[in-house]
Amino acid sequence: MAVQAALLSSHPFIPFGFGGSADGLVSAFGSLDKGCCFEDDESGASAGALLSGSEGGDVREATRDLLSFIDSASSNIKLALDKPGKSKRKVNHRKYLQKQIKRCSGLMGTAPPRPASPSAADAPAKRPPGAPTVATPAHCKAAPRREATQAAAAASLQSRSLAALFDSLRHIPGGAETAGGAEAVSVPGLGAASAVGDGAGTAVSSVAPGTRKVPLRARNLPPSFFTEPSRVGCGGASGVPSGQGVSLGDLEKGAEAVEFFELLAPDFGSGNDSGVLMAADPLDPFPAGATVLRGPLELESGPFEQPAMVGNLLYPEPWNTPSCPQTKKPPVAGVRGGVTLNEPVRLLYPTALDSPGGEDAPALSSFTPFFPDCALPPPHQVSYDYSAGYSRAVYPSLWRPDGVWEGASGEEGGHPD
């Protein structure tokens, strides 16, 4: 780039100190501007012939040196671009990330617990002996003691800030705080469990600070997670008095519990009688409205008998005609809905006996009776004319009043009259 910036004349080879005047060189190189590369071919031979007049030997040497310099420079630049030099610092990114993850997880697990009492609040937080120290790269040299103390102070400050952050997120507004941010959930209706509520919370909070698993009491869980529903005849072990009404308001205390049960259903109240769960009440599979529809057992029909209430709702059957004798049990005294078992079943569709025409409904009486002891009425007789030829009812215009056939004389099928 610097060479191109220094070229101010019309031809690139003039400022390199060739012998002779510039005009002579311009005239000599004038024909070489059109794509000449000065290689050992016919173009190079023609260039040598052009330069033979004015100091051809010196110009050829200078041109050859210039071309070799350009070639070597371009090759060096190409090699430098293709093959970069080795980096002075080698970084194993996988190992570095693993160390960073281990360091962060160690800081999260070794969060200093909160003091259990106000008197112990002034005690300084100590790092546990098993806690991992600040991870340093393996290839680095040992840092001085001053830098090590500064790094330890920064790590402790960071761990304290992280612990304060997560303890504030774990805080529940309605619960009582204990050591380590854990809350002691005390249930008033649990008898012996309520007496040791504070002791259980303190025991749960006294978890080793080096452990990374957060106890259940320290998590943001509803108090109903730690209670069991009471059953009839099974209690004592959990401390729940069996056979007594335990209200949801006694089991759940706090604003978050009220909101939780308001989301479930409006009937679950915390202080009213609608939220009382009675363990002694059995679950009724039928609602209250279904008990009204159920009648006494003696009025219900047998398994193979027709119900009394749906007599006119069933489809008519050929054996349900009035001529069929009644073979059912004697009915029970009492009228339900104005229909008794003494009254014969009214058919929804009229049969051949009730139809006015009598010719359109012989189909219902053509079935084979299901009960052999039930006599069926005789089927309606339909008159048919089986005489040869056309009947008089179908073609009345072909017959005279005296019964003489008016068709062609030689036509077959004429009436024998």
Curated annotation (Swiss-Prot):
The protein's matches in Pfam families, at most eight in alphabetical order, are given as:
TEADIR3
InterPro entries given for it? FAM181, TEADIR3_omega_loop
* Protein's UniProt name: Protein FAM181B
Ranked from the top, the taxonomy reads: Eukaryota, Metazoa, Chordata, Craniata, Vertebrata
List every stretch annotated Disordered: 104-147
Q: Which organism is it from?
A: Mus musculus
Q: Which family does it belong to?
A: Belongs to the FAM181 family.
